[in-house]
C-alpha cells in the first residue's frame, strides 16, 4: 500500500485515498475531489466551483474508451458500445470502423434526466452514475488502429449539468461486466 515513485499508489482492501485537484479560472475556483477505495471498483468524483463567477459549466468526461480483451478483434468490437439512460429511455450507439477516419455516425447528445452513461466491451464496463440526475450526456466514438487492416472503436462519454453547475457528484464503476458489482 502507499505511493511508489509518486506515480502509482496501491490500496489494500481496508484503505482509501482522496485526491484533490483545483483550477482557478478568473474569480472562480474549480475543485475536483476523487475518492479511491481498495475494496471497490467504484470511484467517487465530486466537482465544485466557488467564487464570484460561478457561470462555468462543469463536465466529467471519459474519452479513452476501454481496451480490447479478445485476440479476435471482431468478436470484441461486436460487443462494444456506448449507452445512456435519459428520461427513462436507454440509448445505445455502436459502430465497427473500417478505416482510421471512421467515427460514430450519429453522435448522441441527450438532455433531460440523465441517470447513467456507460462504455462497454465484451467483458468490462465503465459506468458513470450521478448521485442525482444530471441534465446532459454526450456519447461519441472515434477509431484506433491496431494493424494495417484492424481498427477498433474508442468510445467517449461526457456528463454535465448546466442547470446546477456549481456542484456535481458522479460515481464511476470500471470493472467486470457483472450487474451484481455495479
Feature annotation, model-predicted:
Residues 1-182:
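Soluble non-transmembrane domains of integral membrane proteins
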